[in-house]
């Protein structure tokens, strides 16, 4: 059972064009990765993991559900794989397995390893599906969580072995607001006894937990001590949540709060297909005005993979984007 056979089954089915397209893309990506690992052509690759009926159901079923849920954009924190080795049909393999590493090429997927877990957490099938979703590794600006679900693994890893997903609607503060105006909470604190590396960790942590923005400002305190003014922007509803995070992960013993009015442009994303992979384009609207910006992470990936400069990638993407607009 090779990629062409599986894709033929999908194409002849009564599935929607949406489900057919994404399901076939996943099977093709897996076949391409396996072919590269085994130094064969795609047509000669006979699936092991994905050849089973249950795996076909997993992949096709996922995209049926995705279509029914009408999900517009996927956001993700970095995904975690284990470490060590695993025994599969081809023998003992390192973790991440070769097919997973091959699938990571041409992507901006962020995968971290937990060296305390000595088993595989990221499979080729799982990563191929995840790759097809074109996830953004940034926190959505504001959101109202509607549902939360968990998928539990059977392996005993010694840790919480589950994948958590949530469905949310991008929204603004629950306070009444006009079309483009709302309120945000600014949290500030002065820090003069933590290293840049420690503060960098704090910034990443706050953004991962949903802060609207985090930034540092160099300041001089009394006795001319150099320090950093740490500023966090969030919603008024999350005041206590971020207060606790800051007390826990920084050396501060106090902070200041200020509620502020702001004007924002409506935001959406589109995916631009390029010869070098997918690139996210951020679209911002305000009373007939339109501003578009190119996702930096996607350009960085292309620049590194194809030995371009960032400027060259930006120009290329901008040219292709202008053609789609025209």
UniProtKB/Swiss-Prot annotation:
Q: Which residues form a coiled coil?
A: none
- Keyword terms, alphabetized: Nickel
The reply to whether Flavoprotein figures as a keyword in the UniProt entry is no
Q: Which family does it belong to?
A: Belongs to the LarC family.
* PANTHER family with a match to the protein in the record: NICKEL INSERTION PROTEIN-RELATED, PYRIDINIUM-3,5-BISTHIOCARBOXYLIC ACID MONONUCLEOTIDE NICKEL INSERTION PROTEIN
Give the protein's recorded name.
Answer: Putative nickel insertion protein
Q: Taxonomic classification, please?
A: Bacteria, Bacillati, Bacillota, Bacilli, Lactobacillales
């Amino acid at each position: 059972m090779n990629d062409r056979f599986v894709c033929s089954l999908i194409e002849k089915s009564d599935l929607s064009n949406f489900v057919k397209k994404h399901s076939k893309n996943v099977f093709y990506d897996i076949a391409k990765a396996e072919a590269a690992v085994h130094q064969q052509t795609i047509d000669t690759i006979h699936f092991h993991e994905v050849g089973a009926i249950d795996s076909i159901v997993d992949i096709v079923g996922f995209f049926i559900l995705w279509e029914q849920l009408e999900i517009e954009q996927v956001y993700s924190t970095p995904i975690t794989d284990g470490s060590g080795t695993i025994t599969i049909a081809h023998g003992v393999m390192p973790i991440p397995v070769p097919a997973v590493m091959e699938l990571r090429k041409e992507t901006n997927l962020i995968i971290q390893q937990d060296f305390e877990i000595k088993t595989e957490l990221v499979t080729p099938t799982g990563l191929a599906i995840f790759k097809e979703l074109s996830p953004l590794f940034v926190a959505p600006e504001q959101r109202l969580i509607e549902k939360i679900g968990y998928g539990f693994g059977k392996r005993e890893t010694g840790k919480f072995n589950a994948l958590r997903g949530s469905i949310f609607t991008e929204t603004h503060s629950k306070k009444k607001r006009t079309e483009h105006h709302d309120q945000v909470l600014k949290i500030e604190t002065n820090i003069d006894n933590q290293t840049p590396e420690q503060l960098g960790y704090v910034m990443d942590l706050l953004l991962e937990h949903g802060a609207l923005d985090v930034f540092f400002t160099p300041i001089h305190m009394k006795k001319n001590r150099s320090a950093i003014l740490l500023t966090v922007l969030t919603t008024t509803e999350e005041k206590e949540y971020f207060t606790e995070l800051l007390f826990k992960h920084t050396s501060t013993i106090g902070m200041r709060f200020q509620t502020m009015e702001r004007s924002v442009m409506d935001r959406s994303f589109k995916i631009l297909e390029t010869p070098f992979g997918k690139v996210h384009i951020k679209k911002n609207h305000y009373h007939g005005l339109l501003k578009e910006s190119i996702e930096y992470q996607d350009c960085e990936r292309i620049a590194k993979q194809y030995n371009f400069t960032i400027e060259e990638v930006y120009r290329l993407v901008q040219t292709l984007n202008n053609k789609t607009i025209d």
